[in-house]
């Protein structure tokens, strides 16, 4: 009686072995793949071992966390045929060795898990199929497609009396995974303090406990320093720079004169403003990153570099944003040079303004490359603008139906960015218009009371002659 359980156990093991022999032997494994770059050819290998007769091999694309399996390729051993289920992909995959699928140009959308299912016939009956499967994760990388450096909160005015914070934004798009972004100044990496939140706009100059290193010996222009201090002395003595009240008799240096754009414009005065304060230490930089996923699976990275701007040191400084990414063979880079506006070029149309014309005065560039984008303010020296306003913000000043009274009037254009400010003065010469009798227009360029009375008399004369 005691031997009965042992006998039954032996019989069960024997039957299991017989069933295994009947079903056949089948194991499946897929070789792991390192991350691949979009556009490369990828081969998914499904290795299997069996002593049975193969029925089919099916590849699946797994989506939605494994809840959906999309059949992408099938090899039917019964009919020795294979066909694609990826109609939307226009049969991009090829079955190389019955157990291998090749994607000639992998895409970011191909990223994700895949499964290979292999089926063999049961040896006991051909109506049953024994299945085994393996899985692999295809990690598709994509290098960044664009990089750009811009200034935040621009255009912005130049601060003459106090320091202000300045932020450069490096925008990197199209990368997967997110790239590493960092800044350099004049070719040297910037040791920045990481920030998780943006600094408050009203927090004042940014500070850090780390020791400062002086930059005066490296970047400060003694000429700029002396001129800045001379302007400060003039202000303390009660005087003002001539650029704020230009004189009609002033003859500026011909080297800085702009070419006149209309006839008989006698002078164009260019000035440059400098700050009334000077820093003597290297600024502390603060760096903050943000990441925004895109619908195509890539990530947009924004790196924000903030520091307390010092125009004496930062003007003409070269800042570069560099990107490192596993899909790039070398870093990606974008550069900007911080430059204050200098020597605005003014174009006036028409070239010969007459009474009643609409005159346009446009800033048509600078003598240098300016960054960040400047803001423009127009004023009329000694009076208000034609429309009665004190000033106008914009790149182009439009004077509609100019009257003769504007002949000889001077206009000031102030171009400024956080690095500095420059003033340009130009004089408007208005010529007589033979189509408009002298004295018949008012200050707005329209027909005045005298012209109206003359028109009325002529009309009455014509009516009387007709009657």
UniProtKB/Swiss-Prot annotation:
Disulfide bonds join 46-116. InterPro entries: Ig-like_dom, Ig-like_dom_sf, Ig-like_fold, Ig_sub, Ig_V-set, Nectin/Nectin-like. It is found in: Postsynaptic cell membrane. One of its GO terms (biological process) is homophilic cell adhesion via plasma membrane adhesion molecules. Changing residue 467 to M: In a colorectal cancer sample; somatic mutation. SMART domains: IG. Glycans are attached at residues 82, 165, 407, 444. Keywords: Cell membrane, Disulfide bond, Glycoprotein, GPI-anchor, Immunoglobulin domain, Lipoprotein, Membrane, Postsynaptic cell membrane, Repeat, Signal, Synapse. Residues 25-132, 344-429 form the Ig-like domain. SUPFAM superfamilies: Immunoglobulin. Residues 229-259 are annotated as: Disordered. Residues 1-24 form the signal peptide. It is a lipid-anchor; GPI-anchor. Gene3D superfamilies: Immunoglobulins. PROSITE patterns: IG_LIKE. GO terms for cellular component: adherens junction; external side of plasma membrane; inhibitory synapse; postsynaptic density membrane; presynaptic membrane. Residues 234-247 have a biased composition (Basic and acidic residues). Involved in synaptic inhibition in the brain. Selectively regulates inhibitory presynaptic differentiation through interacting with presynaptic NRXN2. Ig-like 1 domain is indispensable for synaptogenic activity whereas Ig-like 2 domain is secondarily responsible for the activity. Interacts (Ig-like 1 domain) with NRXN2 (via Laminin G-like 1 domain) in a trans-interaction manner. This is Immunoglobulin superfamily member 21. It comes from Homo sapiens (Human). The lineage of its organism: Eukaryota, Metazoa, Chordata, Craniata, Vertebrata. The gene is IGSF21.
């Amino acid at each position: 009686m005691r031997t009965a359980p042992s006998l039954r156990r032996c019989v069960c093991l024997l039957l299991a072995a017989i069933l295994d022999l009947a079903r056949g032997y089948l194991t499946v494994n897929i070789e792991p793949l390192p991350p691949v770059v979009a556009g490369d050819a990828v081969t998914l290998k499904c290795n299997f071992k069996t002593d049975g007769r193969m029925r089919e091999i099916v590849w699946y694309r797994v989506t939605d966390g494994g809840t959906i399996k999309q059949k992408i390729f099938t090899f039917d051993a019964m009919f020795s045929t294979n066909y694609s289920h990826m109609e939307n992909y226009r049969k991009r995959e090829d079955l190389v060795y019955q157990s291998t699928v090749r994607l000639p140009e992998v895409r970011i959308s191909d990223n994700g898990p895949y499964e290979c299912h292999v089926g063999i016939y049961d040896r006991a009956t051909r109506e049953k199929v024994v299945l085994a499967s393996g899985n692999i994760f295809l990690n598709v990388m994509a290098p960044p497609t664009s990089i750009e450096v811009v200034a935040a909160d621009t255009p912005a005015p130049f601060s003459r009396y106090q320091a202000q914070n300045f932020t450069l934004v490096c925008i990197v798009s199209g990368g997967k995974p997110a790239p590493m972004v960092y800044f350099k100044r004049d070719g040297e990496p910037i040791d920045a303090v990481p920030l998780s939140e943006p600094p408050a706009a009203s927090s004042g100059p940014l500070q850090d406990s780390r020791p400062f290193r002086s930059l005066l010996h490296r970047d400060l222009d003694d000429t700029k320093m002396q001129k800045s201090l001379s302007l400060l002395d003039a202000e303390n003595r009660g005087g003002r720079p001539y650029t704020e009240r230009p004189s009609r008799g002033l003859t500026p240096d011909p080297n800085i004169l702009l070419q006149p754009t209309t006839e008989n414009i006698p002078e164009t005065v260019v000035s440059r403003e400098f700050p009334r304060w000077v820093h003597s230490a290297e600024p502390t930089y603060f760096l903050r990153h943000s990441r925004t996923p895109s619908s195509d699976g890539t990530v947009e990275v924004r790196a924000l570099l903030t520091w307390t701007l010092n125009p004496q040191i930062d003007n003409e400084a070269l800042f570069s944003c560099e990107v490192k990414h596993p899909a790039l063979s070398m870093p990606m880079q974008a550069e900007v040079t911080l430059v204050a506006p200098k020597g605005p070029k003014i174009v006036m149309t028409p070239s010969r303004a007459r009474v009643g014309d609409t005159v346009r005065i446009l800033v048509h560039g600078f003598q240098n490359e300016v960054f960040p984008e400047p803001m423009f303010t127009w004023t009329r020296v000694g009076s208000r603008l034609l429309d009665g306003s004190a000033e106008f913000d914009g790149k182009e000043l439009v004077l509609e139906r100019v009257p003769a009274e504007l002949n000889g009037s001077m206009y000031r254009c102030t171009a400024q960015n956080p690095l500095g400010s420059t003033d340009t003065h130009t004089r408007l010469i208005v010529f007589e218009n033979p189509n408009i009798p002298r004295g018949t227009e008012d200050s707005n360029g329209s027909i005045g009371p005298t012209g109206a009375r003359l028109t009325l008399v002529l009309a009455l004369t014509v009516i009387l002659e007709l009657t």
